[in-house]
Amino acid sequence: MNIVCYGLQWGDEGKGKVTTYLSREFDYVVRYSGGSNAGHTVNYGEFKLVHHLVPSFDIRGNTKAYIANGVVVDLDVLIKEIEEIKKIGFDVYDRINISSLTHIVLPVHKMLDEKLEIAKGEKAVGTTKRGIGPAYADKVHRIGLRLVDLFDKETALEKLKFISKMYKNLYGIEWDDYEILFENFEKLSRIIVPPLEMKEELKNANVLFEGTQGVLLDIDMGSYPYVTGSYCNTTGVESGLGFPIKIDKRIGVFKAYVTRVGKGPFPTELFGEEAEKIRIAGREFGATTGRPRRCGWLDLPILRYAIETSGCDEMIMTKADILSGLEKVKVGIRYLSNGRKFEIPNDISMIDKVTVEYIEFNGWKNLEDDNFAKFVDFIERETGLKIAYISTGEKIDDIRKV
């Protein structure tokens, strides 16, 4: 069986924990998009890991991992992650493969990312400055460097010199320290494989595809221009993988409230003491940047939008425990714009111009409370989808089947 596990909001839904929990039943976990801008936190109890590039698979088991060519890879970050895992007693080099067609994030990409954010001023997107957008841009400009290019050092050096010249002439960015790149490549060369080799490997395997960010950050279907540089919707699986594959189920992960990092529209956003209470209780600070996340009430119109555009089959709810103890919990149920009501936005670009109609629930003391059961039932009715699992805490096994 092949399943996609992905985010239904603006990322940070708890996909890392959920994917790691589900991974035990699969032969492979495959990352198909994004880069080191992802920050998937996994709490094993005795230790905690933050995955930026290593797919979220249970390192204590037998599941293998694959980084497909839809991902852009910072070799330094990937090596450091693998080495960090090794330090706690798990050598995963023999359980990870990476596509030879994967594009590489270079130092010039990070420099340009920062320059662009500064140049945009108040219109800055609020990127992680990890060079993800510029790396994808070079891929589209057909000047990007792939892992396969590094097998021929002489040709790779020619390409690197050309890239350096372009960045110096166009942006005033200088970089010519190529040797570290080749050193990192040597460390990873034995795990690099052609996509068609992985096609054979995955043909008869049970595969869990791990989404990064969330549908609302997808380069096409997200809240553009406040989005990431990749296809993080379920539609990105096959393009990111490089070959067709049958998807049996799409499982969308959402938080019982909403957060987002950086700028962009956020119809149900909370401010002041209300927002800070949720932010502190939920530890809502970016795993990649450490930035405080913006917090707000659950937004059903935008959740329905994400469900429709991704073909979601069932959902997993996370962080409902964070709302335990609140006297009242609100849910945005529809948008109001120019005298009209919207259950789901036809055009996501409209959401910065709407007001929100809310419904209020009595709060719950814990997740066994009848008030919480009413909250869950309401969401299932309003979305038309079953909530298959509910996360009950921070650790991997703090999750229950509904």
From Swiss-Prot:
Catalytic residues per the record? 12, 40
Q: What is its main location?
A: cytoplasm
What's the top EC group for this one?
A: ligase
- Which SMART domains is this protein grouped with? Adenylsucc_synt
- Top-rank taxon of the source lineage equals Bacteria
Keyword annotations: Cytoplasm, GTP-binding, Ligase, Magnesium, Metal-binding, Nucleotide-binding, Purine biosynthesis
Q: Which Gene Ontology cellular component terms are annotated?
A: cytoplasm
Enumerate the Gene Ontology biological process terms.
Answer: 'de novo' AMP biosynthetic process; IMP metabolic process
What note does UniProt attach to the cofactor annotation? Binds 1 Mg(2+) ion per subunit.
Q: Where in the cell is it found?
A: Cytoplasm
Molecular-function annotations in GO? adenylosuccinate synthase activity; GTP binding; magnesium ion binding
Record pathway:
Purine metabolism; AMP biosynthesis via de novo pathway; AMP from IMP: step 1/2
Q: So where does substrate get bound?
A: 287-293
Cofactor(s) for this protein?
A: Mg(2+)
Q: What EC number(s) has UniProt assigned to this enzyme?
A: 6.3.4.4
Q: Where does IMP bind?
A: 12-15, 37-40, 128, 142, 213, 228, 291
Binding residues for GTP? 11-17, 39-41, 293, 319-321, 391-393
**Similarity field:** Belongs to the adenylosuccinate synthetase family.
Q: Supply the NCBIfam families for this chain.
A: PRK01117.1, PRK13783.1, purA
Its recorded name reads Adenylosuccinate synthetase
Q: Which gene encodes it?
A: purA
